[in-house]
């Protein structure tokens, strides 16, 4: 492994350690929430209703931490399968991880007793190495440097490991978003128009509305498995052209 890749791996491992410590706090808070809302061996909706804010904030913390964990895993996989010359994926993954930890910690710290935690426990979850990682990642200079690298790459974030099938889907709907959706987006939003036929008809012809329908029923999805990744790829490309005019259609 090249020296640069070793440095990236070390940074990803550090990010993973800080994230794991933060997730430990969330797990403890979830344990407390579960104990407070159980009725026998099942969660009571009535009791859970008394902990709406806690439930919401823990759900958000967990979702963000899970997303950060997957992004770190993706960056680690890229080091093995498609090393990125300037490490932009690693940088983005570590930055997102730090931002996730910062927002999660802020939620827990705002009302620690409601989560069954203390201020001391929250503070103890981040050691000196973790604090140093957070400070370096969240520094304005770091954000500016990452942004400059993304601009230099014209928005290309490197290999995505989608595979041939999903890459073809992405490229097809990316062209459609650029050539058809984007030129119409401003007028659709400004005039609060319904989605025009110029967008709907080609998408229908491309089979977009059958992406989640099994082939048995006339759709494009294989009968024996779902294609969630394909749905995400198409949604992201159409959303890039316009979230309101095309990105929400597939859902």
Q: What is each residue range found by the language model?
A:
Residues 177-187:
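N-terminal capping segment at the start of a domain
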Residues 34-45, 49, 55, 66-118, ...:
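C-terminal helix-coil-helix/basic helical segment that borders enzyme active sites and/or dimer interfaces
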Residues 79-82, 162, 205-251:
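Internal helix-loop-helix
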Residues 195-196:
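His/Cys-centered metal/cofactor-coordination and adjacent catalytic loops
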Residues 1-22, 101-173:
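Intrinsic disorder at enzyme termini
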Residues 7-21, 46, 50-60, 82-85, ...:
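Non-transmembrane, amphipathic alpha-helical segments
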Residues 1-15, 26-52, 228:
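A glycine-rich, basic-preceded beta-loop-alpha segment at the flavin cofactor/substrate interface
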Residues 53-65, 202-207:
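Core structural elements
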């Amino acid at each position: 492994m090249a020296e640069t890749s070793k440095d990236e791996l070390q940074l990803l491992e550090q990010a993973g350690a800080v994230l794991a410590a933060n997730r430990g706090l969330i797990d403890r808070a979830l344990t407390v929430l579960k104990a407070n809302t159980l009725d026998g061996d099942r969660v009571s909706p009535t009791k859970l209703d008394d902990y709406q804010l806690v439930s919401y904030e823990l759900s958000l913390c967990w979702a963000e931490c899970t997303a950060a964990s997957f992004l770190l895993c993706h960056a680690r996989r890229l080091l093995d399968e498609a090393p990125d010359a300037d490490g932009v994926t690693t940088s983005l993954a570590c930055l997102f991880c730090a931002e996730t930890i910062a927002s999660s910690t802020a939620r827990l710290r705002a009302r620690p007793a409601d989560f069954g935690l203390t201020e001391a426990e929250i503070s103890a979850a981040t050691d000196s190495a973790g604090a140093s990682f957070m400070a370096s990642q969240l520094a304005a200079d770091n954000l500016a440097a990452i942004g400059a690298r993304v601009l230099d790459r014209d928005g290309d974030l490197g290999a995505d490991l989608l595979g041939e099938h999903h890459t073809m889907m992405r490229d097809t709907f990316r062209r459609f978003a650029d050539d058809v959706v984007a030129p119409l987006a401003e007028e659709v939003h400004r005039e609060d128009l319904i989605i025009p036929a110029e967008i709907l008809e080609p998408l229908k012809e491309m089979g977009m509305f059958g992406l989640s329908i099994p082939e048995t029923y006339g759709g494009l999805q294989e009968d024996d498995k779902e294609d969630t990744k394909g749905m995400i790829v198409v949604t992201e490309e159409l959303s890039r052209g316009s979230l309101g005019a095309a990105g929400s259609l597939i859902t």
